[in-house]
C-alpha cells in the first residue's frame, strides 16, 4: 500500500500554516473542518491496523542488516519475550512490559513466549506457553496454537516445551550455523549445543538500526496512539476549568486513554502547574492549580507497544497572561520553524541550533536577553532557558533506538541531545522546544560574568511565574518533508477557546 494513501493530512493542515477564523460562525466551521479531517485520519490508520503486525517483514530487514557485516550469516535468530516475574515479597506478577526486540519480530504481546527465525528458509516459529490446568482455574484458557497462528505473522506456532528440540533440529539443517540471540535474554533451560557458534551482540544491534525507519503499519500505530492522546489532552484542558489540583487532571488524562482502550502510558505523565513547569521531568502531579498561570502537560499513551509523546501548555484562567503569551509565541515559532526544516537526510544538530537562534531572537525582543545575538549563541547563554535537546526518535520506546547521543560532548548546547547526526526518511521524531524559568538552572548564569552581561535580571523577574512552556509534536520524516502525526491543538486562538469554554 502506498504510504500516502492512508495519511491524507498534509503539511498545510497539520503544521497550522493557515490561520483559522477567530469568531463565531467561521470559527465553528473551522472546528468542524478539523474534526472531519481527524475522522478521515482515524478511518485511514484503522484500515491499516486491520492487518497483522508485520513481524516477518521486520525479520527479513534484520537479516539483511546482519548480512551487511556478516555476508555468509546463516542459522537461527532466537528471541525471548518478557517472562512472568513476581513482585518482590509478593505472589502477584509485576506489571507486564513486552521486550521490544521480541515484539518487533512477532507482534506478540504475551508473556513467557519465544521466537525462532530460520535465516535460510525465512521461517518464523512462535513458541507460546502450554496450558496449565491450575492456571486456567484463575485466569481462564490461554491463547491456543490455532488462535496464535491466526493472530500473528508467523509460519508455525508451538508450545515452549518444544523450544530445545526445535532449535536442535534447525541447527542440524546447515553446518556451522550460528544462533543469534541477545545477552541476558535467554532462559537457563534453553540450550544451543548443536550450533557451530553463538552470537549475542549482532542481532540486537541490527534490530536497533532497523527500528529507526518505520513501515506503514508502525506509523499507523504511532498515529493511533497520537489520536487517543490528543483527545486526552483536549479533555484535560476542558477539565481544568473545574479541577482543583494537578492530580485531577492527571486522572482525566488516564481516564480518556483507558476509555479508548489504551491503558498503558508511554512514560510517566507530567502535569505541572505554574513554576513546576520549569522542572523538565516533574513527576509529583499533585499540586493545587489555584493562583497558577499555566499548566504544562507532557503525556502520551501507547497503542500496542507504540508510543506517543505530546506536550502542550495552556492557560489555567482561559487566557494567557502577557508574559505567558510572550513566551508561548516564541516556543511556537521555534517548533514551527524547526518542523518546516525537516526532511529525510537533514542533520538534527542543525535543527537544534536553529531552535536556539529563534529563542535568542525572541528573548532579545522581550529584553530578557541583551547584546549581540551571535555573541549570545557563541557563549551558549541561551542554554539557561532552553537546556534540553530538541527531540528524539519515537517508536516502541519513547526515547527510541538510533539516537547516537553524546553525553560527554564538551559543548553544553549539544550535550543533552538524545538525537544527533543525519535523520533518515521513514524515522519518527519528536520536535519539542521549550523555554523555562528555572532558578536552579538560571542562577549560575546570573552569577557568571560570561553570561550575566547578556541577561537583564530586571526584565527576567517579570517571567518567573510563567514557569515553562514546551510544545511537542510527533513527526514522520519523509524524503522531501514531513507528516505531523499529532492533532492536539496548539494555536493560541484554539487553546484559549477551549480553555475558556
UniProtKB/Swiss-Prot annotation:
Cystine bridges: none
Matches recorded under Pfam families: AMP_N, Peptidase_M24
Cofactor: Mn(2+)
Listed GO MF terms: manganese ion binding; metalloaminopeptidase activity
Bound cofactor: record note: Binds 2 manganese ions per subunit.
EC number: 3.4.11.9
SUPFAM superfamilies reported in the protein's UniProt record: Creatinase/aminopeptidase, Creatinase/prolidase N-terminal domain
Biased composition (Polar residues): 12-25
Binding residues for Mn(2+) 2: 298, 309, 472
EC class (word): hydrolase
Function (record text): Catalyzes the removal of a penultimate prolyl residue from the N-termini of peptides.
Family: Belongs to the peptidase M24B family.
Protein name: Probable Xaa-Pro aminopeptidase pepP
Taxonomic source organism: Metarhizium acridum (strain CQMa 102)
Organism classification: Eukaryota, Fungi, Dikarya, Ascomycota, Pezizomycotina
Amino acid at each position: 500500500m502506498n504510504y500516502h494513501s492512508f495519511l491524507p493530512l498534509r503539511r498545510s493542515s497539520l503544521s497550522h500554516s493557515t490561520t483559522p477564523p477567530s469568531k463565531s460562525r467561521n470559527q465553528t466551521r473551522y472546528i468542524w473542518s478539523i474534526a472531519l479531517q481527524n475522522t478521515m485520519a482515524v478511518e485511514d490508520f484503522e484500515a491499516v491496523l486491520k492487518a497483522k503486525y508485520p513481524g516477518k517483514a521486520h525479520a527479513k530487514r534484520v537479516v539483511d542488516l546482519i548480512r551487511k557485516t556478516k555476508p555468509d550469516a546463516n542459522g537461527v535468530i532466537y528471541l525471548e519475550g518478557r517472562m512472568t516475574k513476581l513482585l518482590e515479597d509478593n505472589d502477584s506478577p509485576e506489571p507486564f512490559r513486552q521486550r521490544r526486540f521480541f515484539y518487533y519480530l512477532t507482534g506478540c504481546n504475551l508473556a513467557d513466549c519465544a521466537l525462532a527465525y530460520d535465516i535460510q528458509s525465512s521461517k518464523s516459529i512462535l513458541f507460546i506457553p502450554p496450558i496449565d490446568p491450575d492456571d486456567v482455574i484463575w485466569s481462564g484458557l490461554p491463547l491456543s496454537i490455532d488462535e496464535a497462528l491466526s493472530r500473528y505473522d508467523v509460519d508455525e506456532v508451538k508450545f515452549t516445551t518444544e523450544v530445545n528440540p526445535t532449535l536442535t533440529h534447525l541447527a542440524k539443517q546447515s553446518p556451522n550455523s550460528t544462533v543469534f540471540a541477545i545477552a541476558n535474554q535467554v532462559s537457563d533451560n534453553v540450550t544451543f549445543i548443536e550450533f557451530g557458534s553463538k552470537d549475542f551482540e549482532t542481532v540486537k544491534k541490527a534490530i536497533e538500526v532497523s527500528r529507526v525507519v518505520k513501515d506503514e503499519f508502525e506509523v499507523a500505530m504511532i498515529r493511533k496512539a497520537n489520536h487517543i492522546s490528543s483527545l486526552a489532552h483536549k479533555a484535560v484542558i476542558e477539565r481544568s476549568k473545574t479541577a482543583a489540583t494537578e492530580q485531577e487532571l492527571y486522572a482525566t488524562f488516564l481516564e480518556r486513554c483507558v476509555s479508548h482502550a489504551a491503558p498503558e502510558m508511554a512514560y510517566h505523565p507530567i502535569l505541572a502547574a505554574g513554576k513546576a513547569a520549569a522542572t523538565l521531568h516533574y513527576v509529583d502531579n499533585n499540586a493545587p492549580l489555584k493562583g497558577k498561570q499555566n499548566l504544562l502537560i507532557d503525556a502520551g499513551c501507547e497503542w500496542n507497544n507504540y508510543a506517543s509523546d505530546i506536550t502542550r501548555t495552556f492557560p489555567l484562567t482561559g487566557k494567557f497572561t502577557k508574559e505567558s503569551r510572550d513566551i508561548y509565541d516564541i516556543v511556537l515559532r521555534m517548533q514551527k520553524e524547526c518542523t518546516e526544516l525537516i526532511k529525510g537526510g537533514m542533520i538534527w544538530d542543525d535543527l537544534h541550533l536553529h531552535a536556539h537562534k529563534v529563542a535568542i531572537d525572541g528573548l532579545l525582543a522581550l529584553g530578557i536577553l541583551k547584546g549581540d545575538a551571535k555573541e549570545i549563541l557563541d557563549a551558549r547563554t541561551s542554554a539557561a532557558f532552553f537546556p534540553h535537546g530538541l527531540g528524539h526518535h519515537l517508536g516502541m520506546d519513547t526515547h527510541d533506538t538510533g539516537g547516537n547521543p553524546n553525553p560527554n560532548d564538551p559543548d553544553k548546547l549539544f550535550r543533552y541531545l538524545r538525537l544527533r547526526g543525519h535523520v533518515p526518511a521513514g524515522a519518527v521524531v519528536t520536535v519539542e522546544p521549550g523555554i523555562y524559568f528555572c532558578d536552579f538552572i538560571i542562577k549560575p548564569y546570573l552569577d557568571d560574568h560570561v553570561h550575566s552581561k547578556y541577561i537583564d535580571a530586571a526584565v527576567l523577574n517579570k517571567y518567573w511565574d510563567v514557569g515553562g512552556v514546551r510544545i511537542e509534536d510527533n513527526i514522520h520524516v519523509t524524503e522531501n518533508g514531513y507528516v505531523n502525526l499529532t492533532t492536539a491543538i496548539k494555536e493560541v486562538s484554539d487553546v484559549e477557546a477551549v480553555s475558556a469554554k
